[in-house]
Amino acid sequence: MNKSRGGTRTPCTHIVITGASSGIGQATAQAFAARGGKLVLAARDGEALEAVAETCRRAGAEVLVVPLDVADADAVRQLARSARDFCGSIDLWFSNVGVGAVGKFVDVPMEVHERTIRSNLIGHMNDAHAVLPIFMAQRHGIFVNMISLGGLAGTPYAAAYGASKFGLRGFSEALRAEMTEWPDIHICDVYPAFVDTPALHHAGNYTGKALTAPPPILDPRRVAAAVVRLADRPRDSLLLGTPTWAVRFAHPFAPSLLSRIGNLAFGRYFASAERAPVTRGNLFDPPRDSGGIDGGFRKPATKRRKAALATGVGVAAGVLLLGLLMPRRQPGR
């Protein structure tokens, strides 16, 4: 919600969402559409965007569709202008684009690493650079960055993805510092664990093996609901999922251990996984089947709860074990 004159708050009804054609972006568009108002939806796949927009219109929202690539700064600036003209103002901008490639760093071409950084970091910076002047002119606004668990700990087999998310985390922290003189402009970060979206189906794959997401896996609608809550009550950071909280706790104490555990787990999985073709995925072109919210990776609720518990206990036990095994520093050393 945005503060108006007199100190009261008005609902966020003018929303911009990038990466809105599937997954978390689509779920968030539909969640905001249920509240009415005006939505501006952007992504590379115009056809998939139109399908999402039609669903949102049926829910009662007015919708503008803008096909673009967030790595194109000029296109993003035009998106911001079009959104302001369509809505009259911009209450919340959800910077949601994310791509990636899975594989050992040296096995993935540098052009793929560069593309990942351009989309996941420069793309979000383009979003902020375009909308923050509008926020400052209207003296309010909420900018939401989709980061992920990858912004809290190193990600073996996804080095560029992890670098982009660490960079995005630092970028958000810097923006928050710069916005302190604007009390009604908020920079919010969302850190979900693994989410059941089509993203992994569309990722670049340089492992030669089939990809899957480790449990527990979040419903994209849960992440969307969290973004909607930020519209009502902005906060700096929002962590979602047991693995995220576990890593947030453990990483400051044992960053190297966490990375080694992750590398070992991925290595064991790929050693026995089914073979799959090497592909660049959707990094340079949108996939033909890019629509849909769900990726089809989730397990039944009982198994999800067990997996969540196992993840939390496993990380905590690893950190405790490391603490017991680490040699204590002696006085004077």
Residue ranges, per PLM feature:
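The beta1-alpha1 cofactor-binding region of Rossmann-like NAD(H)/NADP(H)-dependent oxidoreductases
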Residues: 46, 68-78, 110
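Conserved glycine-rich cofactor-binding loop
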Residues: 21-22
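Hydrophobic alpha-helical topogenic segments used for membrane insertion/localization
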Residues: 303-330
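Conserved glycine-rich Rossmann-like NAD(P)H-binding loop of the short-chain dehydrogenase/reductase
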Residues: 37-52
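Active-site helix of classical SDR
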Residues: 128, 164
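SDR active-site lid
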Residues: 180-274
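Substrate-binding pocket helix/loop in short-chain dehydrogenase/reductase
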Residues: 104-105, 112-117, 316
